[in-house]
Amino acid sequence: MPQGLSRSEAQRRLKKWFEKLDILSWWDRKLEELSKGMQQKVQFVITVVHEPKLLIFDEPFSGFAPVNARLLKNEMLELRDKGHTIIYSTHNMESVEEVCDYFAIIDKSRVALSGKVDEVRRKFREGIYDVSYEGNVSLQDCERYKVISSGFQGNETYFKVSKINGTSNSQLAGELAKHGELMYFAEKLPSMNDIFVKTVGE
């Protein structure tokens, strides 16, 4: 029985979570009869059912199929948006990027890097931009940028370019616009996985 809840209230909340996680049909089953993924869902429900202000998870997405991992991420984001504080440990840096506001990378029992996710990603920016044009377009290196990669799909040409130091965003966009109609122009910030590797290695 979840602490501080009457039996009827506990059952009401549990059934609500079982419905949300699509496991209500397993309501009367014993835990040992469930698959590992189902057991993890039940463990998640038990953790959140009494609505604690602080939630702590250890590798919450480990072992889940992508669809179920996404389902749990969405539930964690909803809890966060309702004012719950969530702390979790993970080696899945993609989930850090999607879920976390703040993070800390711990290496050899010390904090190697910490801060707001968005701020740290901007701090590690490398001046890389994703660009696309309508139609078949050719780009060559120039004083404003270097071409890293290119591709063509449908009726669009895609490029990844590196901005030369001293070039402003407006100067870069202006130079790129000389070559055709820009469909997309945006800075590509490094992923949290990239930052993790740069901070502590593979």
Predicted regions and their residues:
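Short, charged/small-residue-rich alpha-helical element at the C-terminal edge
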Residues: Y129-E202
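Conserved protein kinase catalytic domain
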Residues: F18, K73, R121, N193-V197
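A generic structural signal for secondary-structure junctions
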Residues: Q43, R122-R125, V200-G201
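ABC transporter nucleotide-binding domains
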Residues: M1-D107, L113
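ABC transporter nucleotide-binding domain
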Residues: N74-K160
